Amino acid sequence: MSKGPKSIILFSDGTGNSSAKLFKTNVWRMYEAVDLGPPAEGKRDQISYYDDGVGTSSFKPLTLLGGAFGWGLQRNVLDIYRYACRNYRDGDDIYAFGFSRGAFTVRLVVALIASEGLVRSSSEAELDRKSRAAYHAFRATFLPRRLQWPTRLFRRARAVIGAWVGRLRGRAAYDPADNCRPPIRFVGVWDTVAAYGGPITEITRAIDNWIYPLSMPNYQLNERVLRARHALAIDDERDAFHPLLWDEVHETALIKAKKVDERRLEQVWFTGMHADVGGGYPDESLSYVSLLWMMEEAERAGLRTLTVVKDRFVALASSYGPIHNSRAGLAAYYRYQPRKIAAWLDPVDKKTLSLRDPAIRDSRGRSRGLLRCVNVHESVINRIATGTDRYAPITLPETFRIIPPQLEGENAPQADNQTPVPPPQTTTPQPMVSREVRARLTEPSTAAARAAVTEPIWNFVWCRRLTYFATLTATVLLLLLPLFVARLPTPPLLADGRTWIGGIIRLLTLVLPAFASKWVEVYADNPFYFFLLAG
């Protein structure tokens, strides 16, 4: 490795995602695509660090805690931060990529670097101590929104005890003035979601409000970040997985003050569910679309990637790929709530107030949005216009801006068995849809007509939400049935008086764990109430 400046590239994967998983995410694919070999003359060396997502512990209780409440987030943040501290030298560039809660993680890492800088150390023990001190100083502004004094008291006691122990051991107190404060060259994230992900939003929000602060104090992008890109999913239907956007209202103020470049931040929406955009499903063709967009944006910021790896991604990308069901199986217990993108727009549309995060407010305490405009990738329009599945997302707002495809996107010319040598590459991206199609979706009169047609469909969304709550209530009653079944009136007997149905229910003991036998016996003895709730 040369002794000149280098690029440090940090990766944090999503919940339950790791290098050992069979189906990879875009974070892992980006990690694979980074060129870590000897650079050409005048280019930088590149080193990278990949961190498994939260909820990947081999100890299952920790896996559940990580999946529901972000347990292990601090460890992930500090692991990535220490790698940057350990390897940074003056003049180095820093890149960071993440998906889902891994996106939340790298945004915290970037905010930590921008706020506290990178600590200097001469040993791993010193690095461990200083990095924890930097993290605690950074987290000082993270407080429960309602009940704050217990958190303040605990942190004050921890600081006093830590300072006392440090003096006994002859250690200097943590001083952020000793840290180096590099700019962040590029941050690329896919569909950032909150650190907690329980299916009942009120429970996780109550923890954040009253017990332990997990959310960010704000959604502003620090001025030390030179470029940031956010790929977002249009079609996910889980309330707990609504994305954490960057604050474009604050960004506009920075641009007007000429503190940042006007193209510094870009957030673009893509077809698909959460993992259709960030990756992780067996059929992965749709996720490559946002990956190629992110790769090209990072390359413009100086990142070097391997052509042989990227060519494979280009060949496999398809905006016509299958859209999966984000609420399949047990995920059906995540609250049903499609992403109404208009709810994030500023100024506020009063019709969307019930869908907004109540914590997002202006300096006067009034609810406000985070988006100035909605950017939709042209691949979305291509699927709407020419797709084979009648794709028509109801979540798009009335007006939006179409982002043209990248130069090496899914429509880039490729070699095949008929054309062994691909056509020459052009210097401008090839459009995916005609001007007429673009105009038909964005022209004011047709946009208003489209919005008028899709708005009544949200009435069916509310009906499905009622169905969700009915299902959740029936499930809870079914689980609690052994506690109150003795108080219920005797149900009507079957017409022929037979009780064979209980024997069939008892067959469940053959496939369920032993601790479930108590419930199975109650259900078998009370088949009327079992089928009333389960049916």
Place the predicted regions along the sequence by residue.
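Active-site- or binding-pocket-proximal scaffold segments within functional domains
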Residues: 1-535
